[in-house]
Regions:
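Extracellular jelly-roll beta-sandwich "head" domains, especially the C-terminal globular C1q domain
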Residues: 1-115
Length: 115
């Protein structure tokens, strides 16, 4: 996979599992957080939602941690035009976590078969 301006390009054609894992921490009174996978078959002229997940949190001022995942199967028939990108949305005051030693917030691509 290569990435440019947040858009991921596949290294070869094929059927892929695309997974988006998000870990975060609420720092205030945010009530929800969401993650989404978008895909295009026309090099970004239009984008379709491939997977969406939302997590709700108890509306208290204390810190709260959350994890969510969304996954989709994507048929990449042309590496020049078929791409994916990722999006996160939060009401307010959410810190997304990352780590160099383990996958906390990450994208996972698995080639499953030929197209």
């Amino acid at each position: 996979m290569t990435v440019s301006s947040g858009v991921f390009t596949f290294p070869s054609t094929g059927i892929y599992s695309v997974q988006f894992n998000v870990t975060g921490k609420r720092n205030g009174d945010s009530r929800y957080i969401g993650c989404q996978i978008y895909g295009t078959a026309n090099n970004g002229t239009s984008w379709d939602s491939l997977g969406l997940s939302y997590e709700s949190m108890d509306n208290q001022s204390a810190e709260a941690y959350m994890f969510m995942r969304t996954e989709s199967i994507f048929d990449c028939t042309n590496t020049s035009t078929h791409k994916v990108k990722f999006y996160v949305n939060a009401e307010a005051n959410v810190t997304f976590t990352g780590d160099t030693d383990r996958n906390t917030t990450c994208m996972i691509f698995k080639r499953l078969a030929d197209t």
